[in-house]
A protein has these predicted regions:
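Basic, amphipathic alpha-helical segments enriched in Lys/Arg and hydrophobic/aromatic residues
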Residues: 363-394, 398-426
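Short, conserved catalytic/metal-binding motifs centered on acidic residues
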Residues: 73-74, 88, 106-110, 158-168, ...
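Domain-level cores of phosphate- or acyl-group-handling catalytic modules
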Residues: 209-265
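Short acidic (Asp/Glu) and glycine-rich catalytic loops that position anionic groups and cofactors
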Residues: 15-20, 50-54, 92, 318-323, ...
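Short amphipathic alpha-helical "interface-anchor" segments enriched in bulky aromatics
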Residues: 88, 280, 336-370, 375, ...
Length: 448
């Protein structure tokens, strides 16, 4: 904010009430209730904007909007409490356009930009002759990782733990297909490092999760490695338990941990096992064991087994009095307890999908076709990663927030503050009407 300054206006007034009603005075000044958004817009323009335009190129050379401005306008929708792209024109434009230099584009421009960034679907044909569409969006996936590296959220040369899963998004778009969950939609594969989304590939909702998953993972791993980001450990559910997928994962990480799918031949070995060790994990008593098994011909891996006694007392045809869960891994040094506890951390990643659905628009996709909606998924992933970047640097206690707070709380606690732009001494000043002096410098950033 080198061209602007901030003034905190601390006001304490009492209203005189006559006949049960407060006196009301109408002022025509341009005061916005979203005063905190201008901080966010400027940080986005400083940290994210140059990377977006550098990777995607200039959209125009004269008076049109660049892709960084389109992305920032889309960001402002969710940072001001909106839930669909049209909110920027219907409700937010009078407030966002108050910024003296940063332009905000209309919802029509955002949607045109999304269409321009879309790429053609890739069609794969199964052995049975059925065709399934995938959308890889290579350029935007590259942008997603480059932004994380530029903000320091990922550090080149470091190794991280990666989670991969498919998220089923319910929608009734033109090309949405019926999923096994009995609703129409898409089933994008999403890769996550920590609390950050690092890769998304969209696919037809009726495609089996294992179908060409190894190709998706190969592209995600290669994209990370192109920026010198490496995977130390990978966690995945039973949808990734196939020979082709495991061989791909092995090439790109030190260790993998995959939920093994159940089969009758495996239970014969489990029931004959001895030497179970009792462990209490998260308040639940389990019995743990591990064996070396030849999951596929010529491929032996470690199988970590946990079993829990059935509470209802009934016996299953295959499992007997226990419920069995298995983890396939190439980690031969960690104890069974360490492996189970590490794999269980994967459950926390579901919060990310819930956050995207409810806070960043995944529940209300804006376009009619998968290729364009894939662009939207990736742009909102960029926006959420930027939100996590801000929250790590925000003085959260000063605003009654936590580092893990959802964006709805951020809107209420930080964005929603009265403010007014004024021009004085040949430069612009943002007056913020609050008694919270932390607005003077809320973010711990290198540029202040």
């Amino acid at each position: 904010m080198s061209d602007f300054s901030l003034t905190l206006v601390l006001q304490f007034k009492t209203s005189k009430i006559i006949n049960g009603m407060a006196n009301i005075s109408i002022k025509s000044q341009k005061i916005t209730p979203f005063g905190g958004i201008f901080h966010v817009m400027e940080k986005f323009d400083h940290y994210i904007g140059p990377v977006v335009d550098g990777e995607l190129g200039l959209r125009c050379t004269t008076f049109g909007y660049q892709y960084s401005e389109i992305t920032r306008s889309l960001m402002s929708v969710y940072f001001c409490g909106g839930d669909c792209v049209e909110d920027v024109t219907s409700h937010l434009m009078p407030h966002l356009s108050l910024h003296p230099t940063l332009r905000t584009c209309s919802s029509d421009t955002i949607l045109r930009g999304i269409k321009e960034l879309s790429t053609t679907n890739t069609t794969y044909t199964s052995e049975t002759g059925r065709s399934y569409d995938f959308n890889t969006a290579v350029r935007l996936n590259r942008l997603l990782v480059k932004i994380l590296v530029s903000t320091g959220q990922l550090v080149a040369g470091n190794s991280y733990d990666l989670d991969f899963d498919h998220q089923f998004i319910e929608t009734e778009k033109y090309d949405a297909k019926m999923t096994y969950k009995k609703f129409t939609g898409y089933s994008p594969g999403v890769a996550v490092i920590g609390d950050l989304i690092v890769g998304i590939e969209n696919r037809d909702g009726n495609a089996n999760v294992r179908f060409h998953q190894q190709d998706t993972l190969e592209r995600i791993f290669s994209n990370l490695e192109s920026d010198d980001i490496h995977v130390r450990r990978a966690r995945m559910d039973c949808g990734s338990c196939s020979r082709e997928i495991v061989e791909t994962i092995e090439k790109h990480c030190e260790h993998f941990y995959i939920r093994a799918n159940r089969c009758s031949s495996l239970y014969d070995n489990l029931l004959a096992l001895r030497g179970w060790k009792r462990e209490v994990i998260n308040g639940i008593e389990y019995e743990l064991n591990s064996i070396i098994t030849e999951k596929w011909e010529g491929k032996a891996y470690r199988l970590v087994i946990q079993r829990e006694r059935r509470m209802d007392g009934e016996q299953d045809l295959w499992e007997g009095e226990y419920t069995y869960r298995c983890i396939l891994t190439d980690d031969y040094t960690s104890t069974p307890r360490e492996i189970v506890e590490f794999y269980n951390l994967r459950g926390g990643k579901e919060r990310i999908f819930d956050d995207m659905n409810n806070g960043f628009g995944w529940a209300r996709l804006p376009k009619s076709f998968m290729a364009e909606n894939t662009v939207f998924l990736l742009l909102t992933a960029v926006i959420r990663n930027f939100y996590k970047f801000l929250m790590e640097r925000l003085d959260t206690k000063a605003f009654g927030l936590k580092k893990s707070s959802r964006i709805k709380a951020f809107v209420f606690k930080f964005i929603s503050v009265p403010a007014k732009w004024i021009r004085t001494a040949r430069h612009y000043v943002l007056n913020i009407y609050t008694d919270n002096s932390s607005y003077q410098n809320p973010f711990t950033l290198a540029d202040g």
